[in-house]
């Protein structure tokens, strides 16, 4: 079977590849930008097309891709999408079920590979506030889906019960993969003092919002009428 990108997916992937190349060769800041694509516009296939295109650019030297979500059902959904299209990816994706398995995969992989995991697996062991560096290569690409939810917590805070200083999971993930390029995908980015999606991942790579999606017929409009009963 064939999978063909819609126009917004095609242009979004093209811009995301350009941003990743810029982060790899020029800025070297690990910020792959934010793809703001509304719910229902095909972000799972967008991620698939992005990985397929990464493989076509020799600058990335057969990158390792880590797809990170914040819950098991979304992790399984994305994994299934990629597994059904493994013929196009030069390898079969793997799903890290346990923290030890994730560490083993990332520490032992020298190039290539697509790993699916949830962000909680990057957390330090109980009672600690540091994590081991798992891979220092710069050709590691992290795709953070629903990036507005868990990609914060870079400043230290103290647990009032234990007195242990801790950080958010996003910092621990970056400590484990310090030279990776991080692409954020979300349908609802956040911009506030302590949570700002753009400040974490870089500026928007491309935007396909609800208005665009409705005009294309990709999603249907939702009407709401308030009533007092």
Kindly label every feature range from the protein language model.
Residues 1-229:
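RecA-like P-loop NTPase motor core of helicase/translocase proteins
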């Amino acid at each position: 079977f064939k999978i063909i990108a819609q126009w917004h997916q095609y242009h979004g992937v093209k811009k995301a590849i350009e941003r990743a190349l810029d982060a790899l060769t020029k800025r070297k800041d690990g910020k792959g930008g934010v793809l703001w694509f509304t719910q229902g516009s095909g972000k799972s296939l967008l991620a698939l097309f992005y990985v397929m295109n990464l493989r076509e650019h020799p600058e990335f030297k057969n990158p390792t891709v880590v797809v990170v979500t914040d819950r098991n059902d979304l992790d399984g959904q994305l994994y299934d999408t990629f597994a059904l299209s493994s013929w196009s990816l030069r390898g079969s994706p793997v799903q890290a079920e346990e923290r030890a398995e994730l560490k083993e995969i990332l520490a032992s992989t020298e190039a290539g590979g697509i790993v699916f995991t949830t962000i909680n697996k990057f957390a330090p062991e109980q009672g600690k506030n540091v994590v081991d560096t798992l891979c220092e290569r710069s050709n590691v690409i992290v795709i953070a889906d629903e990036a507005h939810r868990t990609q914060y917590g870079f400043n230290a805070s103290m647990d009032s019960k234990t007195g242990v200083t801790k950080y958010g999971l996003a910092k621990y993930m970056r400590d484990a993969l310090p030279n990776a390029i991080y692409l954020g995908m979300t349908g609802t980015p956040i911009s506030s003092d302590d949570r700002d999606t753009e400040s974490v991942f870089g500026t928007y790579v491309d935007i396909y919002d609800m208005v665009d999606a409705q005009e294309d017929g990709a999603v249907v409009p939702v009407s709401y009428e308030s009533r007092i009963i």
